[in-house]
Each structure stands twice: as C-alpha cells, then as structure tokens.
Amino acid sequence: RLSREAATWMSALPTQIRFQMGGKSLAVVHGAPSSVNQFIFPSTPVEPKLSEISATGCDGIICGHSGLPFTQIIDGLLWHNAGAIGLPANDGTRRTWFSVITPDEQGLRFEHLPLEYDAEGASDEMLAVGLPNEYANALTSGWWDNCDILPDEETKQQGIPLSFESTYWSSLRHTAE
C-alpha cells in the first residue's frame, strides 16, 4: 500500500524518459509510448511495435507492464521488456526478472537476469496487508491466476521456465549470444 505522499510523488513522474547510450537513443515507458497501460508481448505483431518506436523518434523502447521479459530487434530498432521485479513471469518458477544493459563503443548488450527472493515471506506480507490472494499465490507458485491479458502464444507457454541469451544491438549488426 502506498502512502498519500508516495502516490503524489509517483503521479508527478514523467510517462517517458529518453536517454542516449552506446550510440542509441532510447525511450523508457511503462507499457507503450501511446499508453502506460498497453500490453505489448513477444507475439504482438511487428507493426504496432514499429509504430510506437517511430512515434518516440528514438531507436528503441525499454518497457515493462506485460510482466514477460523479452528483447526483439526489428528492422534495426529495439523493443526490450525488462520483465517484472515484483511478479514471476508465469513460467512456473518463483523467479522475477530484471535487465542489465551494458554499453560499449559499438552498441548495447541486453541481459535478462532472474532474481531469486523469499517468495514465501513476500507472499505472507502481501496477505497480511490484505492484498489479493491471487497475487500472493502467484509469488509462490510462479503461475498467474488469470491469463485473460495474454495472447494465445504466451498463454501456451504458461509454466515453461524462461531462459535467455544476451542480445547485442549495434548499428552494424545484432546477435543473440
């Protein structure tokens, strides 16, 4: 639960942050540049992703909201979802996800990394403050109670543990390593 002061502080935050790194311009948003609550998934068609990137005037987007980490390079442009630090990725594990971006002279390396934490303790704390059982259970089971927001492709992947290779994004090339 947020205090009124914390909620006021959060409401004043920008909906988009832009920065340069590794020779690339990036926009950081919650869901998508056009809507903070828009869900973008790996299976979301290319056209909406390219349209959202184009609208920013940047080379790529870093986002969250969908809870599923992924990185895609489309026509030389980037869509990177860092995952969710506060909820497992519906992969049947308790792990949450974060990303590390490492710049060098020729581009950026993106790594999705799992975070192990005290899932039982976090679940107990959620229940103690009256948060929904479904969220508390997701922490300990690694399964989402409801997949209504997920496209069919992501729904079919429920319970399959995620693993990632790093992705290198350069103006010259990109590779998954």
Where are these regions (language model features)?
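Conserved catalytic scaffold of divalent metal-dependent phosphoesterases
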Residues: 1-60
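Short solvent-exposed loop/turn micro-motifs enriched in small/polar/acidic residues
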Residues: 10-12, 64-65, 92-94
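Short, acidic/polar N-cap/turn motifs at the starts of alpha helices
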Residues: 14-18, 68-69, 98
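Positions that flank functional sites
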Residues: 25, 68, 141
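Active-site environment of divalent metal-dependent phosphoester hydrolases
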Residues: 34-36, 61-73, 87-90
